[in-house]
Amino acid sequence: LEEFVKTLQNFINGKNVPSSSDKTQDLINPATGQVFAKAPVSNAKDIDDAMKSAEKAFETWRDSTPGERQKAINKIADAIEARSEELIKIESENTGKPIAVTRQEEIGPMLDQIRFFAGAARHLEGRSAAEYFKGHTSFIRREPIGVCAQVTPWNYPMMMAVWKWAPAIAAGNTVVLKPSDTTPVSTLWMAELMQEFLPEGVINVVTGDRETGRLLVDHEIPQFVSITGSVRAGMEVAKEASKDLKKVHLELGGKAPVVIFDDANLEAACEWIAVAGYFNAGQDCTAATRVIVEASAYEDVVTLLSEQAKNNIKVGMPEEDVLVGPVNNANQLSRVQGFLDRVPGHARVTAGGSKVERPGYFWSPTVVADLRQDDEMIQNEMFAPVITIQKFADEAEAVRMANGVKYGLASSVWTKDHGRAMRMAKAFDFGCVWINTHIPMVAEMPHGGFKHSGYGKDLSGYGFEEYTRIKHVMTNLNA
């Protein structure tokens, strides 16, 4: 393990290979602030080598049977599960995540997602077959697209890698994946493990920065690009991909509204919302961090969430029994500090609001109340352990406030009134609506948003179909 993390290389054509670039980037453990490895900043030649490797592998991988792909992917899941403690340690060192939380909340769902897509490989179907033109039968083929260029973020490195490569290779595609420049280690580890079960070139991983990502998108070989990242990054990818008319899937930022009516079980709701807001240090595009409360319950919710932040949400080192670790990097910590430095005069910080005085990039669980709709903390994704609270008067205002942001990924409503809950679910302009819960996900259901949260879906059969193309075949019955 120590040897692996200190000598990072790209993974191309089934092998760990040194970059042709002499430029590297330090990898820092966010829990300590200390450098623990270096990763190459890959250049155009590295990208070209990876793309050509994937292109060659596609010639044969596309002809593998769904059953063969299912078998290979299930073996990958079994191998990851057998070595999961090693992976947890690697992920924690690179991200600062609490080890116990990573073991309990990430490994299990990630393995389930891999196995879901293994099974999905055998369930592609064309939804139409008939004689629409006399004497001729038409049917639909769903085919792999080819080489897929993929970019993953730093908030869930290993899980987001799975969301990309699992549906891609299950559908018969090959992959060139660039993980975030700050968190490449678990993805490289995974690719090396996967190679035992895949032909050379099916999975390729290159590390690097924003320019490396641009080279990935600009390359002539891939005709599909999938990114999970910031709105800025997604817009840049869409712009570059449009020059070659590449198909694009974007899973971008979020600013999830959490609408609480006064008939909700406030204590239970606030206990759950605190976990859903502070989990992963709030670095989740679906995090329950924008709370909107009916006026008659407002002060009770402010008090309950502030008490949760102060007393029940523990922050600490990966080895400790805590929910919250550090934010991912120094720039992110500085960004959070900036938001809190600019809290408007009409708002009040009722919990936290400052860095934790220890090495690393830790921020205290924070609650900011009395914010207005046009405040920057409401309109912009903070990606931090900061919950904001606003007040609404009636259903119509709650909907306006919930929808009044540029994002459209996830949302929740808390009420005992089923009719009201369903009205809100219909009115919310978000790709996911939870009712009396927030943040659970399952492999069978799609994840993806509207507006500046991007387009396309991860997970589910819909996410699997993103990695296919549709072909109409017509045959003359009398020939």
Please state what every model-predicted region is.
Residues 32-38, 222, 259, 355, ...:
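Conserved C-terminal structural/oligomerization subdomain of aldehyde/semialdehyde dehydrogenase
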Residues 36-42, 57-63, 150, 258-261, ...:
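Short, well-ordered beta-strand elements within core beta-sheets of diverse protein domains
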Residues 33, 69, 91, 114, ...:
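Residue-level signal for inorganic ion chemistry
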Residues 126-268, 392:
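Rossmann-like NAD(P) dinucleotide-binding subdomain of oxidoreductase/dehydrogenase enzymes
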